[in-house]
């Protein structure tokens, strides 16, 4: 009996040491750690002071931007084959600043929307987000198996990540459409009832800019709920499509973050290395300090800018009866 137990224990240890199990186990660990961070933010973000919420915002944005930057580097690697070394196009193609910046800006916009929506999520939305973790892995494994016959090894990971993100997002939207179609619709009687039902989680936020953004988002939510409530009764297909469009941005942000969790460290390092030529995989290359510096500089600059603008705006609104967002909402 003891021999059988030792044999089983050894088999389990051997299984855990296999590259595939270690890689995808690490993905699950990173993905669920990410969900834990999002859960904490959903509970405490409305009460976080400006520097703390800015730290989470731009930290998540920097992480999410790795996916954009990695795909951009792979495209640059392909383009490198047609440029002569020493030419202007070759030097421009070797650069990273533009794509690191654009990837960070797009990620910051996505993360801002995600942070403002997190406190409003109900159990159903959290269920979809949690289900996205194993769904993404399942789609990735199938995509990797199918695409390895289509891509060269240098370009396979980027192709797999890109297709996995698209397919996972589509599947989540399709599942959400079924959920909405089965959900009973309760139309609102009046506009006042709609706006009374709108949640204002950031109304008392210590950050004036976050509070203002939350108020404007809640206004948009109210107008959307009013239109959707009416459309659900008379134009159900339009109602269904609009609900899917609204949630698609959230699913895109989540799948993008999961894509970063699926990237291995050597793939992330390629973002900061000189571009390789096809067939030169064994040539030693090292990360460039300038690329790393730019990647760190953008989040830091945006962090300082946000904290500074928030302080100036808070001071300017200190003696005002209504802020700009409050006045805008009242006028509407």
Q: What is the meaning of each model-derived region?
A:
Residues 2-18, 68-93, 140-163, 261-286:
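Cytoplasmic membrane-interface regions of multi-pass membrane proteins
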Residues 15-29, 287-292:
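N-terminal membrane topogenic signal
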Residues 21-143:
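Transmembrane alpha-helical insertion/packing segments
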Residues 104-126, 176-194, 301-318:
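Alpha-helical transmembrane segments and their membrane-interface junctions
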Residues 126-192:
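Long, hydrophobic alpha/beta structural blocks
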Residues 162-176, 285-310:
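Internal/C-terminal transmembrane anchor helices
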Residues 184-233, 317-332:
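Membrane-interfacial helical/loop segments at transmembrane boundaries in membrane proteins
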Residues 224-250:
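Individual transmembrane alpha-helix segments
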């Amino acid at each position: 009996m003891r021999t059988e137990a030792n044999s089983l224990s050894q088999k389990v240890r051997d299984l855990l040491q296999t590259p595939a199990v270690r890689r995808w186990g690490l993905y699950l660990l990173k993905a669920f750690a990410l969900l834990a961070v999002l859960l904490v933010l959903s509970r405490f973000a409305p009460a976080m002071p400006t520097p703390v919420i800015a730290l989470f915002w731009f930290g998540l944005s920097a992480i999410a931007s790795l996916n954009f930057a990695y795909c951009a580097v792979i495209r640059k690697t392909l383009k490198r084959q047609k440029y002569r070394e020493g030419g202007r196009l070759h030097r421009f193609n070797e650069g990273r600043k533009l794509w690191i910046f654009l990837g960070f800006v797009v990620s910051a916009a996505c993360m801002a929307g995600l942070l403002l929506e997190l406190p409003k999520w109900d159990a159903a939305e959290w269920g979809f987000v949690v289900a996205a973790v194993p769904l993404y892995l399942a789609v990735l494994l199938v995509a990797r198996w199918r695409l390895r016959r289509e891509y060269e090894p240098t370009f396979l990971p980027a192709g797999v990540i890109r297709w996995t993100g698209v397919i996972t997002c589509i599947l989540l939207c399709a599942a959400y459409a079924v959920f909405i179609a089965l959900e009973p619709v309760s139309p609102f009687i009046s506009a006042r009832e709609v706006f009374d039902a709108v949640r204002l989680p950031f109304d008392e936020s210590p950050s004036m800019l976050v509070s203002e953004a939350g108020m404007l988002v809640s206004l948009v939510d109210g107008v959307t709920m009013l239109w959707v409530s009416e459309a659900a009764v008379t134009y159900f297909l339009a109602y269904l499509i609009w609900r899917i469009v609204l949630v698609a941005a959230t699913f895109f942000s989540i799948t993008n973050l999961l894509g970063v969790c699926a990237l291995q460290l050597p793939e992330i390092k390629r973002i900061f290395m000189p571009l390789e030529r096809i067939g030169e995989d064994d040539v030693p290359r090292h990360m460039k300090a300038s690329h790393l510096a730019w990647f760190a500089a953008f989040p830091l600059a945006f962090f300082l800018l946000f904290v500074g603008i928030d302080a100036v705006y808070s001071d300017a609104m200190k003696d005002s009866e209504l802020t700009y967002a409050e006045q805008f909402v009242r006028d509407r």
